Amino acid sequence: MALLLGACAMPMRIGLEPEERSKITALAAHVVVVQDEVIAAVQAPTVGAASGGGLIGAMIDASIANSRVKESQQALGSFYTVIEDVDYRKEFNEAIRSELANYQIKVATVTTTPRALNMDILTKLRNQLPSGQALLLIYPRYSLTADFRNFDVESQVSMWTRSDSPSSSGGMNRPIQRSVLYFQSQSVGMGGRKSLDIWGADNAALFRSTLRESITETLRMAMIDLDVATEPSAKAGNLQEEFSFNNGAITTKLKGQVVKSGDTRTILLASDQKLYSLPRTSASASTAAAK
């Protein structure tokens, strides 16, 4: 999906225009979950870049990356046994039907599949749409951070009309809406095997509940993005808030406009134009945007 969208040279974020929204009477939701199991994100080595690049540097990086993957898989071995029956695809399929049942646009059909998309499949799906219906694509990828402390889900979401109906957003090969949604769980433990032990305790109760929460939050962000009346935008003068974000190696900072905030989680439109659902405890500072 990333390659498919990247080939179109599209911006990270395309807001749904009111004109396009007014034409939509129903959605055909198509969820692509290619993965069969959770993986751990592996930090990319940077020896090659530090040494000036070249073949030798690339070979060193490849060797380090392979070693990290093996170490990660070995650490996850016993954890996989506990979550063997976890089916993210099934969980998403059940959740999307209930979560979107009361959405303001009727969801006519829901398809959840492991089959990856290409342009031919996308065109076929679009051409099957009846009048007034739009195709909502959701393509989630889920993982544990490299230190095993967080469960992350990054989803590419886009909405398409029939291929013979050019959109006002830029033509027939461009979606009428696009966004990248990122969920990060509360941090668990101090990292490594100790964090995996917590995730796996009590038949992986915490992991299972966090997985379901990630799906609910992803759908919540998707619905916010499709509501043209509340389309978030990072404008100067809006209140900016700073949040901690674990990338698996270090804790970095994300800064942006708070779109929605609750007791436990906040949805943030960050400067990279991704929409994030982050735990409230990761909020570290609030500052006014530059005047």
What kind of feature is each model-predicted range?
Residues 4-7:
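C-terminal motif of bacterial Sec signal peptides marking the signal peptidase cleavage site
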Residues 9-99, 231-291:
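A structural "domain/chain start" motif
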Residues 14-25, 115, 122-123, 142-144:
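N-terminal, polar/charged subdomain of small-to-medium soluble alpha/beta proteins
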Residues 21-25, 127-132, 159-177:
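A short, structured loop/turn motif at beta-sheet edges
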Residues 71-82, 164-225:
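Short secondary-structure boundary motifs at beta->alpha junctions and helix caps
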Residues 102-119:
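Short beta-strand->alpha-helix linker/helix-N-cap micro-motif
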Residues 119-146:
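A short, hydrophobic beta-strand-centered structural micro-motif
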Residues 153-158:
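Aromatic/basic-lined ligand-recognition segments
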